[in-house]
Amino acid sequence: FRSNLVANPVDDVKAPKRLKSLPKALSVEQALSLVNQAVKEAAEKKDLETVRDAAIIDLLYSSGLRLSELLGIDVMQSKDRQQESAGWLDWDAAEVTVLGKGGKRRSVPIGGPAMQSLKVWRTVRDQLKQADVSKALFISATGTRLSPRTVQSRLRTLAMRAGLPTHVHPHMMRHSFASHVLQSSQDLRAVQEMLGHASIASTQIYTSLDFQHLAQAYDKAHPRAKAGK
């Protein structure tokens, strides 16, 4: 049959583009519930793990860091060429400097509540005998830099204790940060800089999340939103 055709009728037909899935983000209420749960447990138990967890989760949501960036942070900047810090905290300026994708550094502000959680953690950290053997800000009881798996596991179990109905992972905190800052500020360029995106196209996906938020608010508030549905 095909040998009798002069031209293939589907030569110019393009396959439909695969829709890019939107990043999963927590609602503002869910994110605050998670952070508040961590801070509450830290205040009640005052042990190494809960105080450290509160500082980690507060910082993830406050500054939108990647997990690798978070775990690369040192307590202070080391300018030693042999042991140059990948990231560090400026405790006076309330800023964190991290080494992002492509070896690009960026500095991101830290909110007041997150700085408070970090200061509480630093006090606990400095009391560890093993603290002197590591420059890392976030360490285990043995003084070693935390592993990604440890953070992922503890965040997941904390989210369950907070009653969140979804699997929470560190990158979801970054998505939540971006979505919530964009909802509040509408400043796409600022969000791009804080996330460390080389292209603004990577940041624009959060405008879809922002539109979802607006659509939900419209459906709830507008008297004719559901007309004809």
Predicted regions and their residues:
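Conserved catalytic core of the tyrosine transesterase superfamily
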Residues: 1-229
